[in-house]
Amino acid sequence: GFPIPDPYGWDPSFRTFYSIIDDEHKTLFNGIFHLAIDDNADNLGELRRCTGKHFLNQEVLMQASQYQFYDEHKKAHEEFIRALDNWKGDVKWAKSWLVNHIKTIDFKYKGKI
């Protein structure tokens, strides 16, 4: 996979060039960062809320543009939500998932939605 930024945070290498998606990705990085600092129910709940909102927004854009990899992308989102819902405090896994999801899966829709 891709290297995990240290310090952990969004940087221009994660830019999809869709401002709403990039802004939401920044929020997700912040959510995972806060969870890494303090693994508590409030931080987990906030990350879950922001993640659900972001995935819904992204999926609506994909459906509207008939993005060909929509099903694969939605499945990746569902797997992450399941993992959050079954959270065991694995912050390292969450950091890695977001970095690799954006750079591998999200970048496929650059210029297509």
Swiss-Prot record:
Q: Which Gene3D superfamilies match?
A: Hemerythrin-like
Molecular function (Gene Ontology), one example: oxygen carrier activity
Task: Name a Pfam family for this protein.
Answer: Hemerythrin
Listed A to Z, the keywords are: Iron, Metal-binding, Oxygen transport, Transport
Q: Which residues bind Fe cation 1?
A: 25, 54, 58, 106
Does the UniProt entry include the keyword Iron?
Answer: yes
Q: Which top-rank group of organisms is this from?
A: Eukaryota
Q: Which residues bind Fe cation 2?
A: 58, 73, 77, 101, 106
Q: How does it assemble?
A: Homooctamer.
The function of this protein is: Hemerythrin is a respiratory protein in blood cells of certain marine worms. The oxygen-binding site in each chain contains two iron atoms.
- What is the similarity comment for this entry? Belongs to the hemerythrin family.
Which named protein is this? Hemerythrin
State the species of origin.
Answer: Themiste hennahi (Peanut worm)
